[in-house]
Amino acid sequence: MEILLQKVYDQENLSKEEMNIIATEIFEGRLSKTKMAAFLMALKVKGETAEEMAGIAQAMQQVAIQVAFPAGTAMDNCGTGGDKSNSFNISTTSAFVLAAAGIPVAKHGNRSISSRSGSADVCQELGIDINLRPEDMTYLLEKVGIAFLFAPHVHPNMKYVMDVRKELGTPTIFNLIGPLTNPVHLETQLMGIYRRDLLEQTAEVLGQLGRKRAVVLNGAGFMDEASLAGENHYALYENGEVHLYTLRPEDVGLTSYPLEAITGGDAKENAAILRSVLEGEPGAYLDTVLLNAGFGLFANGKVETVQEGVDLAKDLISSGLAKQKLADLITYQKEVLAK
């Protein structure tokens, strides 16, 4: 262990297997807080590689509480957060559109860290219970096609790093790997990331973690979502290869809006925005969800282009199917809680 830590202190890269060894020590509570802090900061200064990101993500998944679901059928669309945009809950809203398309969505998320309302906060405001058992999450995925997976419940071993992360007060590798560690075995994924320089690398990591197809995007304004404010950069992983692209809202028939047009509020305000979008209320909120749902449908392979994804998302919202998914989730959740 000391030899591996020294490699990082000396600015040497670790293999996936070496990183897995260190991460396992962390997640099993055997690495002291002092050594953990030194390791995380040395890794940050050196710069995290794809192998290192994959190694720590695999170790985190190995100790996670597993949620049973047929491998390769579900997807996730959560992002890293940390873009400081104070936007509404875009990926949570988009998740209901993806589910309405017949894609099982295992929505991995947490409470607010840097924004006023995280996905868990808005879900609770909507009446969605975030404290369900793994078998209940499986039931909802099967019956409704969408379930919320509260990160602290499915990753209890993260308790060993919470104090150190808080004390450091700066982003570390843990800010990047949250969306990589869904306890449901995914085959496709849409992942927003706040660092544009890591698009290609993160797409490679998703491939190493078993994704067949994935899109990693960084929106205009360096958002961890697709944005209407300008050029969106994204990496497509497919067939073992990564290709980089850009897309503007006008390319898919959507109107440009400044970032301020999609500012969110607290959980109550964001829940109201989510409902208004699923009702089809025109404006920047709706168009932002159309763009992000379009990317999600494209990442899943449900459509061949983002344009087709945007068009399908419009139909799923205007038909009421996306809104019905939210209603169904709450209805079937009552069955679970009554057991």
Swiss-Prot record:
Positions of Mg(2+) 1 binding: 91, 225
Residues that, per the record, bind anthranilate 2: 165
Gene Ontology annotations of biological process type: L-tryptophan biosynthetic process
Residues the record lists as binding Mg(2+) 2: 224-225
Sorted UniProt keywords: Amino-acid biosynthesis, Aromatic amino acid biosynthesis, Glycosyltransferase, Magnesium, Metal-binding, Transferase, Tryptophan biosynthesis
InterPro entries: Anthranilate_Pribosyl_Tfrase, Glycosyl_Trfase_fam3, Glycosyl_Trfase_fam3_N_dom, Glycosyl_Trfase_fam3_N_dom_sf, Nuc_phospho_transferase
GO molecular function, one term: anthranilate phosphoribosyltransferase activity
Gene3D superfamilies assigned to the protein according to its UniProt record, in alphabetical order: Nucleoside phosphorylase/phosphoribosyltransferase catalytic domain, Transferase, Pyrimidine Nucleoside Phosphorylase, Chain C
Leading EC class: transferase
Necessary cofactors: Mg(2+)
Domain of life: Bacteria
This protein's record includes keyword Signal: no
Family indicated by similarity: Belongs to the anthranilate phosphoribosyltransferase family.
This protein's name: Anthranilate phosphoribosyltransferase
Organism, scientific name: Listeria monocytogenes serovar 1/2a (strain ATCC BAA-679 / EGD-e)
Encoding gene (name): trpD
